[in-house]
A protein has these predicted regions:
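Hinge/lid segment of periplasmic solute-binding proteins
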Residues: 37-53, 118-178, 229-232, 336-342, ...
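Short, solvent-exposed loop/beta-turn-alpha elements that line the ligand-binding surface or hinge
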Residues: 49-53, 134-151, 188, 193-205, ...
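Extracytoplasmic "Venus flytrap"/periplasmic binding protein-like
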Residues: 76-152, 189-190, 194, 306, ...
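Long, aromatic- and glycine/proline-rich binding clefts that accommodate carbohydrate-like moieties
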Residues: 34-58, 340-344, 393-457, 485, ...
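Extracytoplasmic/periplasmic solute-binding protein
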Residues: 159-173, 177-179, 207-269
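Glycine-centered hinge/linker elements that transmit conformational signals in sensory
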Residues: 211-220, 251-300, 338, 342-345
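Extracytoplasmic/periplasmic substrate-recognition and gating elements
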Residues: 105, 161, 184-185, 282, ...
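Short, polar/charged alpha-helical segment
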Residues: 46-53, 65-85, 180, 184, ...
Length: 506
């Protein structure tokens, strides 16, 4: 997902993208940032060809600023060979929808390739802002034009790429949450004995969200206390959360989704304020007691760094973080992490796990583009041709989304061994199997923003969990009525069918 960014490389990437992609010249960055910008080693696992050379056209690419635009720098030598110059337009992570929608409505034609979060596809495609891609994908020869959609995992193909039976986008980032924890602490004999003495249970990674609170409280220590046989020189925390305004709602949904409830019933009545949902939000609120005091300012970067700097015992994060945790240039806990399914709910004598699938990224061709064919090839080149290299490096936040990404563990060179990389990929498969989707209908941005606003108010103590979710239900009904309830009911039923085709709901 992600807003994910290696902060130390930010300045270099911005400079490199502006200089190298817009002008085609300019000095290369040096030092650690230069290493961050170095293209991954080509794997040659995917066969592709250049198109017939375009006549020096400029393709304008818009996307959220940061390391997920790095592939355009990695492969900057490819585009001139196709007769294409790339110009990058960076926007803030939280501003993607507003910026792109504003330009679409204005008909400015400012973009050729549009990078966006796939929950917006219903809005963008249904309003005619995106070019249908099906005819482009059929062009010959295959090596130039075919993005091999059959290789894209079903959730990312059916939900991320399609609207009303047509393909409008290509996946570049397949997102899901996983739990990441300090295995050295969970296996430490002294910590195991202390946990057993205190709780009468063996110390294990949390299976349920109740376990999450218990284990988080256990590992929360003050400066001067002992942790795994050493005296702490700063406070240490059992867990941390993405509690910042913007996407904190996803960490609430992680706790609620295993209930089997959906955002709406068949007639668009919100189910977001059920007793199970209220209990889930209360768990989220309670978890902040075991988190750093500034956790309400934690987005992706801060949550990642809290773990990789050795300040917390466990987090729920996107599946790219283990790659960064294995990279000594980004992590102080190399070799000390393990990962698995997010905690779940005990239902009917078993634990049910559901992992939220927030954000993700797709690339599409703007319907207003004057260079649609060139824009399509650029999108296809990033989404398919170079995708293994882009998802396997620790210097992007792009996550696996195709079968080929799982069958080449040797590409994930930040891990010490191929076996370790293969184990990581197995855990990612588990996370995706537990996947729970976002809202994939027009209005998704408004529904999710209302949810996030009130989740954040509950985290701040400004509303109780019940007050917060009752307010969400009221606002969701208002959004539905404003967009047209009967229309939204029809679209929601179509979305439910897509969820079923993708294997995400029964």
């Amino acid at each position: 997902m992600s807003m994910r960014w290696n902060a130390r490389a930010l300045g270099a990437v911005v400079a490199a993208l502006v200089l190298a992609l817009t002008a085609g010249t300019g000095p290369a960055p040096t030092g650690p940032a230069a290493a961050a910008m170095q293209a991954p080693k080509a794997q040659h696992a995917i066969t592709w060809e250049y198109p017939p050379k375009f006549n020096n056209v400029t393709v304008h690419v818009v996307g959220d600023a940061g390391h997920n635009l790095a592939p355009y720098e990695f492969w900057k030598d490819h585009f001139p060979k196709a007769g294409i110059a790339i110009k990058i337009i960076e926007v803030p992570f939280e501003g993607v929808y507003e910026k792109e929608k504003t330009e679409f409505v204005a008909g400015s034609g400012a973009f050729d390739v549009v990078t966006f979060y796939p929950a917006y596809i219903g809005d963008f495609a249904s309003n005619g802002y995106l070019e249908p891609l099906d005819e482009y994908m059929k062009k010959q020869p295959d090596g130039v034009w075919d993005p091999h959609q059959e290789d894209v995992l079903p959730p990312f193909r059916e939900l991320y790429n399609k609207w009303a039976g047509k393909t409008y986008a290509l996946t570049i980032d397949g997102d899901a949450h996983m739990m990441i924890y300090r295995k050295d602490l969970f296996t430490n004999p002294a910590e195991k004995a202390a946990f057993k003495s205190k709780y009468g249970k063996d110390l294990r990674p949390p299976e349920t969200w109740s376990d999450w609170l218990r284990v988080g409280a256990f590992f929360t220590r003050k400066k001067g206390q002992q942790l795994a046989g050493r005296t702490l020189d700063r406070d240490f925390y059992g867990s941390a959360e993405f509690a910042k305004r913007g996407f904190s709602f996803a960490w609430f949904v992680d706790r609620w989704a295993a209930s089997g409830e959906l955002y709406f019933d068949d007639t668009m009545n919100p189910q977001i304020n059920t007793p199970t949902a209220v209990a889930a939000l209360q768990n989220f609120v309670d978890s902040l007691k075991n988190a750093p005091p500034d956790v309400r300012g934690y987005g992706y970067d801060e949550l990642r760094d809290a773990l990789l700097n050795g300040n917390v015992a466990m987090v729920v994060q996107w599946t790219d973080v283990p790659k960064k945790g294995a990279d000594p240039s980004q992590s102080k806990v190399v070799g000390k992490l393990d990962y698995g399914r997010v905690p779940g709910l005990a239902i009917g004598g078993r634990v049910v796990h559901r992992a939220m699938m927030p954000v993700g990224r797709v690339v599409a061709v703007a319907a207003s583009s004057k260079n649609k064919l060139a824009a399509y090839w650029v999108a296809k080149h990033i989404a398919y041709d170079m995708s293994l290299e882009d998802v396997s490096t620790a210097f992007t936040g792009l996550d696996v989304n195709r079968g080929v990404h799982f069958t080449h563990p040797e590409a994930y060179t930040d891990f010490k061994t191929v076996a370790e990389a293969a184990s990581y990929l197995d855990r990612v498969k588990e996370a995706l199997a537990d996947g729970y989707p976002e809202i994939f209908i027009p209005g998704a941005a408004q529904y999710e923003d209302a949810l996030d606003l009130h989740v954040n108010k509950a985290l701040a103590g400004q509303e109780t969990p019940k007050q917060a979710l009752d307010a969400v239900a009221k606002e969701w009904n208002a959004i539905t009525d404003r967009l047209g309830r009967q229309k939204q009911i029809q679209l929601w039923r179509q979305a439910l069918n897509s969820y079923k085709i993708a294997g995400l709901v029964k």
